[in-house]
């Protein structure tokens, strides 16, 4: 198995990505030269008779320049992994699947439960974490043979709900899903093999949404899924996108579970894992399909 720790020549789509990388680096260097010329010109030509205004303007331009530099270094080189993932060598491990629910309509939740019952993997168990305490959701969970748990008090919103799930389960790997995210039957089998590399703490998959034709409002979030995540993946620093993400329980426990102070617990838990030496992997193919605003 090669998840990026072996030589670059063996990477998935290596030749294609290398050509794109060379082109991107040329464009980045040209942009860097142009930016340096502009900043140099700006320092000389700012009206320094108003030093506070001039300093604020120069500072704002420098912040923009640094942002462009960081974006350029991140986007210049990308890494992808094969669509089929990597097979688990030996007996496949148990995976806990958390479906976080909070007052979503039944017609939204049911297709997700149906898809969860059709996952093609021998050892997984589903727990419905219902912060809405809806009797109809509990009935559906029983109908499909899934575990159901509803907290007495909804402390810390989704983060608290996921941490509650961690407290009542024990599998070494955890897959998190939102209520509207209908999973692919092979979602577990395509992601689990990455964890044979012991330093990998999470694997984040691409989310796809049921969008109007042409995606007029840009809800596909192509910048994130087609540019940012593949670029961060090259540095082993891909981040969790919250749903359709598999975590190593040990990695979650090493950072105290999902952070409860932030509304973007997926991003922050990724940063905490990076600080502890865990790596994030991005799987660039569709494994879930959710809903998005239509107007």
Residue ranges: model-predicted function:
Residues 113-123:
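Short, acidic, metal-binding catalytic loop of nucleotide-sugar glycosyltransferases
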Residues 1-91, 141:
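N-terminal membrane-anchoring/stem segments of glycan-assembly enzymes
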Residues 150, 154-173, 184-263, 274-275, ...:
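Long helical/loop segments within the catalytic core of UDP-sugar-dependent glycosyltransferases
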């Amino acid at each position: 198995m090669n998840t990026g720790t072996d030589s670059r020549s063996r990477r998935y789509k290596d030749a294609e990505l290398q050509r794109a990388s060379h082109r991107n680096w040329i464009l980045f260097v040209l942009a860097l030269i142009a930016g340096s010329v502009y900043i140099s010109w700006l320092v000389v030509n700012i009206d320094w008779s108003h030093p506070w205004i001039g300093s604020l303007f120069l500072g704002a331009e420098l912040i923009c320049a640094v942002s462009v530099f960081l974006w350029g270094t991140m986007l210049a080189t990308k890494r992808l992994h094969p669509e089929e993932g990597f097979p688990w060598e030996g007996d496949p491990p148990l995976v806990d699947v958390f479906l976080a629910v909070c007052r979503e309509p039944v017609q939204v939740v049911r297709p997700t439960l149906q898809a969860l019952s059709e996952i093609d993997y021998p050892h997984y168990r589903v727990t419905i974490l219902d912060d809405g305490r809806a009797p109809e959701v509990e009935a559906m969970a029983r109908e499909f043979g899934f575990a159901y748990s509803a907290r007495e008090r909804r402390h810390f919103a989704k983060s608290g709900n996921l941490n509650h799930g961690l407290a009542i389960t024990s599998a070494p790997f955890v897959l998190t899903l939102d209520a509207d995210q209908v999973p692919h039957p092979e979602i577990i089998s395509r992601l689990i093999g990455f964890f044979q590399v012991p330093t990998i703490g999470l694997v984040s998959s691409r989310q796809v949404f049921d969008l109007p034709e042409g995606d007029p409002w840009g809800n596909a979030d192509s910048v994130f899924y087609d540019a940012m995540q593949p670029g961060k993946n090259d540095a082993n620093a891909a981040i969790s996108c919250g749903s359709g993400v598999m975590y190593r329980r040990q990695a979650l426990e090493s950072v105290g579970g999902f952070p409860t102070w932030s509304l973007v617990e997926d991003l922050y838990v990724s940063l905490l894992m990076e600080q502890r030496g865990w790596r994030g992997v991005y799987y660039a193919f569709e494994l879930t399909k959710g809903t998005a605003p239509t107007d």
